Amino acid sequence: MWNKLNNKKWKIKNKILGLCLVSYISCVQAEVLIILPESGPLARAASSIKQGFLSAYTTSGQKVPLKWVNSNQKNISQLLKQHVNKKTKMVVGPLARSDVEQLLKSKPKVRTLSLNDVAGSLPQVWQFSLSKKEDAAALKTLLHKDGIQQLLILRQPGSEAEHELLLMSLFSQSDLNFKIVNKAPIFLMPKQGLLYLGNAEGLAAIPELSHKRMYTVANAISEQHSPPKGIKFCDVPVLYLADWPDVVQAYVKEPVDISYQRLIAFGGDAWQITQQYLSQPRSQHTEFQGRTGRIEITEHSIQRSPQCFQYSGTGVKLL
């Protein structure tokens, strides 16, 4: 009886050890390929994304190897043929829209997380970005919640092209009554709101009487200028909520201005999406509170929902 029990224990122990060994070998054999430009016009943005990705990766304690490939002036299809192999469990990148279009044409067989979005799509490719369309959707929800029926739009001269996509997205997503104005009104009628599109310096110059039911965009918020009291805006939450130590660590290591802080947060969320897929590759629906907003992952797409805030005069509060 004693020998039989010992034999049974020995078999169970060996089975557990075997499963652990298989798991370990699987982890060692896995690899994540990251395709980002190291030079060229997008290199600075890519550097901040990489900074955020690596900081979140290090904080997570994951050991899966990362393979970095420079995409500048290189054909994406050729890069995939050259670097994707049996160990590649996921591809992250590219960043440029033209490269994402090339990526879709190449029809990758490995799950891929592109870091920009284009008109086309493939089931195997998740498109993840800091999209103006998502910013517009968050703003639309906020305006509806506040009972706004007519939105006055004040554009800083020279900034029209910069905000055109957000404005067009807002027009297409909302049934509000829109009106372009050349200067801020002295007061707003009931159910009227004012949307300012411009930079922080121009925002600070708007008369105080107009601040009630006033809204703006994320790039009008600056560390150098205090926003008007009561103004509302939608942005990546990590800038206002200290809930992600990896982003703080990345910033302390290499301080950058607020626009690049958003890209650090974006890189951190890109790693978290990657980690989620590696741990649950068959999952068809996942949600988490990310550094750049609420992230919803389905089998074929990723949806990011920025969060909205209000400046109270002493600080920013989550709405």
Label every model-predicted segment:
Residues 254-319:
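Segments of small-molecule ligand-sensing domains
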Residues 44-48, 62-121, 201-202:
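Beta-alpha junction/loop-to-helix N-cap segments that form part of ligand/metal-binding clefts
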Residues 65-79, 129-130, 155-157, 177-186:
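Short beta->alpha junction loops
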Residues 205-268, 278-282:
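Extracellular/periplasmic periplasmic-binding protein-like sensory domains
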Residues 128-151, 237-245, 266-273:
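Hydrophobic alpha-helical segments within soluble ligand-binding/sensing domains
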Residues 31-45, 151-153:
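Short beta-strand segments enriched in small/hydrophobic residues
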Residues 44-60, 135, 158-175:
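Short, solvent-exposed amphipathic alpha-helices that sit
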Residues 104-112, 150-234:
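Extracellular/periplasmic bilobed ligand-binding domains
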